Amino acid sequence: MSASLDLWNIPLRALNINVRKRLGLFLNPRNTVASDWMSVAENMGFSYLEIKNYEDCQDPTRKIYRTGKPLSRAQVGKLVSILDNVTRKDVVEDLRVLIEEDCKRYIERQNEPPVQVPEVDSCVPRTPERQGITLEDDPEGGIPELFDAFICYCQSDFDFVHEMIQQLEQTDHKLKLCVFDRDALPGSCVWTITSELIEKRCKRMVVVISDEYLDSDACDFQTKFALSLCPGARSKRLIPVKYKSMKKPFPSILRFLTVCDYPRPCTQSWFWVRLAKALSLP
């Protein structure tokens, strides 16, 4: 690692989804020669019974990363140290560039001047309201659950959302979608949770466009909030998906964005591949 980076002063939350996914690709497969996720779990202080219970998880590395209290409040340096201890320097070397980039971005964000002075900052509440808002969040405020994309949809289009889950999560794409009705816990302010998920937890947002979408206040808020985070679509953050033929005009605020047109026969065969690729970009 770069000598100019003090990894022991950079929290694990600085590492983005791509690094965490690659950790799983290296450590999830059971290996008789090299150490796998079980060795990492032992070094993190997990008991034998806990490790045995995680064996059935689809992504055990992600599971221990999220639930391991010794690691959840640790630094990037701690993770690198554990990988060294279990003789997985190959993982450290493969991820070195990505880890350094994430750490540098984190330091840059920390050094950026705030948009508002703290006395008038109304964007981030000083309460635990934004902690423990999804199914896999650490209730004690550890590493938050992160997603590849937030899905903006109205209730009448939920069948298409189910298909999206099947095509993008339950296939080789292995993307992680944030579906509000499935992933968000009840009991908190809808607007607070929604803004937190879109801005802090999800890399992108998929907007399911239909006539019913145009009548949804929730979809209107989510779309405008996401657009405000990426003026000019520089980060390709918002991806409109036209779900079915529309009688009403296409929303004007989205006309400057490239659309995934699901009902168009000539492109339907590669619809899911295009969408998955767009959501997989760094």
Curated annotation (Swiss-Prot):
Primary location recorded for the protein, binned into one broad class: cytoplasm
CDD domains referenced in this protein's UniProt entry, alphabetically: Death_MyD88 (cd08312)
Domain Death, first and last residues per copy: 22-99
UniProt xrefs under Gene3D superfamilies: Death Domain, Fas, Toll/interleukin-1 receptor homology (TIR) domain
Annotated spans, Disordered: 117-138
Keyword Aminoacyl-tRNA synthetase among UniProt keywords: no
Any single biological process term in GO: MyD88-dependent toll-like receptor signaling pathway
Presence of keyword Endoplasmic reticulum: no
InterPro entries reported in the protein's UniProt record: DEATH-like_dom_sf, Death_dom, MyD88_Death, Myelin_different_resp_MyD88, TIR_dom, Toll_tir_struct_dom_sf
PROSITE patterns in alphabetical order: DEATH_DOMAIN, TIR
A GO MF label: TIR domain binding
Pfam family, one: TIR_2
Locations listed in the record: Cytoplasm
Domain TIR residue range list: 145-279
Region annotation Intermediate domain: where it falls in the sequence: 100-141
Keywords: Cytoplasm, Immunity, Inflammatory response, Innate immunity
Domain notes: The intermediate domain (ID) is required for the phosphorylation and activation of IRAK.
Function statement: Adapter protein involved in the Toll-like receptor and IL-1 receptor signaling pathway in the innate immune response.
Name of the protein described by the UniProt record: Myeloid differentiation primary response protein MyD88
Source organism: Oncorhynchus mykiss
Gene (name only): myd88
